Amino acid sequence: MSIEKTLDELKKQLNYHAYRYYVEDSPELPDAEYDRMMQQLLLIEKEHPEFMTVDSPSQRVGGEALGGFTQVQHEIPMLSLDNAFNDNELDSFEKRINDRLISDSVSLFCCEPKLDGLAVSLLYVDGLLVQAGTRGDGATGENITENVRTIRCIPLTLQGEGWPTRLEVRGEVFMPKAGFDALNERALKRAEKPFANPRNAAAGSLRQLDSKITATRPLSFYAYSVGIIEGGELEGSHYQRFVQLKNWGLPMCEETKQCHSLTDVKAYYKDILERRDALKYEIDGVVIKVDSISLQEQLGFVARAPRWAIAYKFPAQEELTVLNDVEFQVGRTGAITPVAKLEPIFVGGVTVSNATLHNADEIARLGVHIGDTVIIRRAGDVIPQIVSVVEARRPEDSKAIIYPTTCPACDSQLERIEGEVVTRCVAGLVCPAQRKEALKHFVSRKALDVDGLGDKVVEQLVDKEMVETPADLFKLSAGVLTVLDRMGPKSAQNVVNALNKAKETTLSRFLYSLGIREVGEATAANLALHFQTLNAISSATFEQLIEVSDVGDIVAKHILGFFSEPHNQAVIENLQLMGVNWPDIKALDESVPQPLADKVVVLTGTLYKLKRNEAKAALQELGAKVAGSVSKNTDILFAGEAAGSKLAKAEELGVEIMNEEQLIEILNN
């Protein structure tokens, strides 16, 4: 293909996807793919300037205005930003600006997170908000004044004094993660299609023709620059302008800071990247700006972006790949999970070849076929998932995904209980797949913690029909274990020793090891502390069970069902006959004041000085109820390093947040 034809095809594709992104709010490509196409276009135009045209996507920003809104003209164009994708490109940015300044050099930068929302312009005249517009194509946007007036954090009248007669504030409208989750939860309850991501939700909410709908959406706003300034002056520092705007009532991102060198900028980037998942909003990089306004003016602009700013993008969290097949896996409780087998793709810092498809409803919602090009997303430690399908790229030989009616492991009939989204194999431990997963759970670190008995060993034990129930594990001898692959006499004896050591456990660990549906570590600990004996738990009524913290109607029914099953009773009896035991739990002395009595607390993140289980036990001794998730009933969140979505939700709900040092101080006192 000739260079001209390549350029034409790139322009056509970029224009099409810009329209899908900016106008229809229904992007088909992940941002990283669009960025790559744009970088390819820029490179070709740089090498062959004779082929550059005025209608090239490199010469404009965004898309056309929607027909449903009146238009606003931007007196000062609302431009986009050039991107950097690595440290070398950031170094080149610094060199470019310093080479252009010649006599001056940049010694101060203003850095802020790059919010993933919708750029807007707010015009204040005599302190009153008179107009709000989208960026549109940079020169012309959509008049969204009535919708913006519904966003509570945007002042309709500026506070304080000293603001210019005409002041244009530019910033990003976005939807916080917690608000996005709540919005989608409501949509699902009403059987409506949920939004794909917070950016789409923010854009869709802001572009409602009925502002009453916008008013119901949890939108927020951060200022990031100014445009028109008439009848007054602002500070000569970009950062200090943020402070001015904040004093006048306009929100400023709390992560904005000044950096005194490019080394500081790189450290800032790394810090924000590491804390990305804990922030209460979606970001896709950081924006670095020359802090001095006079130097900004000297540097000026190119056609589509300022020379004095750059967006340092994070590694892509979304990428395009192909769905090659779907494998149906059987979990410990019989749940059938469809797993997408993908063409390997590097995304979110790792190579991904598998992704969850959750259940039959999710497959139907996505409308995905084997052979489809799909958008895969991996954020933080979240399991990779398919978020959408590029239907325009569907091949003619694509195949619909057929959900199984019988168990792929034991051929038993599958069942789906009314009101549940999960399809299950109800064969229990008769099913080899469930048996494997149940035994893996039983010996896991948070359960009986049997060192040396890993997943591969458990799978061999089941495949060779050496073990059927958890009690059978304690009948194994070193001699028997040596028949397994890669299991020598010394390793075999170590496993036997670990099994004997695991017999001495705690009631909460034992309860957790049994694999009762929806009974996690925290719930098991709360049950043990509340009832104090296994007999009391197994004979508890529904009414008694729901008195326990973290135990609702559904969990109570699972517990009742588990202990009423004769097979489960036999498993517990055999385990005790094999010597599995635990110390008695001492009842709390109610005469002694409990500093955290009836407080609902949650632990999240990495603790360096405390073991998580020890911290939980100590908190419970102080009267706290340790929950597994943050809700409006949570009193305190103890957040370690790299705390993620729980921290964001706690901040959104106004929950008290303490760090590990404060936790240790409470425990010591």
From Swiss-Prot:
Keyword Metal-binding in annotation? yes
CDD domains the record matches: BRCT_DNA_ligase_like, LIGANc
- Which residues are recorded as binding Zn(2+)? C407, C410, C425, C431
Provide the residue positions that the database annotates as binding NAD(+).
D31, A32, E33, Y34, D35, S80, L81, E112, R135, E172, K289, K313
Q: Which UniProt keywords apply?
A: DNA damage, DNA repair, DNA replication, Ligase, Magnesium, Manganese, Metal-binding, NAD, Zinc
Gene Ontology cellular component annotations, sorted alphabetically: cytosol
For the BRCT domain, which residue ranges apply?
591-669
Q: What is this protein called?
A: DNA ligase
Q: Which cofactor does it need?
A: Mg(2+); Mn(2+)
GO MF term list: DNA binding; DNA ligase (NAD+) activity; metal ion binding
Name the domain of life this protein comes from.
Answer: Bacteria
